[in-house]
């Protein structure tokens, strides 16, 4: 008889891949030191190898990137920029490489349509952003010069998603997003830490967005590496979209809710802490590697586990939610709540305005 649950071997495999992605296996001992050194050498060599004259697009190009492996908050930053620049009268397009999407491997230029495309084809983040952008577009191609040439024909501003390591496209504004709790990713390259680039490159940033609570010690650490203006933001929950009902509930609906949580994030602890602050009673977690989607069998397994603990639902991020597709309609699955988030400015809205004003100046200077 065919089981609807994953095998114990698959669950073990999942736990192992999560542990590896967080540096809890390969980061041990001499092996970890050797692999971290190799990773840093590759990062250095790659930058020197591709350090040629970058392509200059006719539109203003804003890069949003980081120096660690995932979990810093790039996607909310991109969406915040696009929304606020649109409010100032600009047309915006997002340029993504479609990480883990099939079309990126095929080197096809795709303008993402949420009604036509899946996360498996274009990538989870491009699909999420395309569904949220108003009057904008998300272009996916492995070579961002190709997408920039096409997007510049119709859009004033091009936002380069995960663009800090991109040397092929000229960037007018360089924004680096860091996690306030761990801005330097443990200060070691993967797998001993979460660094993907050298901290001294922070001095190349025009603005640094510090996402989440940042203690005085971490602020001093950031100031040691870069004198660029810091914008402190606090991610918070705006509402929860429950599937399959489509019901949208405010933040206070989470208070006292007993639920399970699954997510595929580079820094899942930040999401879990946010839910706890909102009053969620977390009955269990199912962690996935960054960008990985939960399978049908895994969802049945986790839902049954939470139901046995008298849970009322399962919570996940919007990024995880776009990968679910029709799985939310599976019989026997608890309701799935997709948690939607927004930014609050910790050092006043003026800090965000200064960034937008800087983009205004640069864009007007290019005309």
From Swiss-Prot:
Metal-binding among the record's keywords? no
Keywords for this protein: ATP-binding, Kinase, Lipid A biosynthesis, Lipid biosynthesis, Lipid metabolism, Nucleotide-binding, Transferase
The pathway where this protein functions is:
Glycolipid biosynthesis; lipid IV(A) biosynthesis; lipid IV(A) from (3R)-3-hydroxytetradecanoyl-[acyl-carrier-protein] and UDP-N-acetyl-alpha-D-glucosamine: step 6/6
Give me the reactions it catalyses. a lipid A disaccharide + ATP = a lipid IVA + ADP + H(+)
Q: Detail which positions bind ATP.
A: 68-75
A Gene Ontology molecular function term of the record: tetraacyldisaccharide 4'-kinase activity
- What biological-process terms (Gene Ontology) are attached? lipid A biosynthetic process; lipopolysaccharide core region biosynthetic process
| EC numbers | 2.7.1.130
Q: Which GO terms describe its cellular component?
A: plasma membrane
> Pfam families attached here?
LpxK
Please name every pair of cysteines joined by a disulfide bond in this record: none
PANTHER family annotated for this entry? Answer: TETRAACYLDISACCHARIDE 4'-KINASE, TETRAACYLDISACCHARIDE 4'-KINASE, MITOCHONDRIAL-RELATED
* Annotated family: Belongs to the LpxK family.
Role summary: Transfers the gamma-phosphate of ATP to the 4'-position of a tetraacyldisaccharide 1-phosphate intermediate (termed DS-1-P) to form tetraacyldisaccharide 1,4'-bis-phosphate (lipid IVA).
Instruction: List the NCBIfam families.
Output: lpxK
Q: Which HAMAP family does this UniProt record tie to the protein?
A: LpxK
Protein name (database record)? Tetraacyldisaccharide 4'-kinase
Which organism does this sequence originate in? Chlamydia caviae (strain ATCC VR-813 / DSM 19441 / 03DC25 / GPIC) (Chlamydophila caviae)
Q: What is the lineage of its organism?
A: Bacteria, Pseudomonadati, Chlamydiota, Chlamydiia, Chlamydiales
The UniProt gene name for this protein comes to lpxK
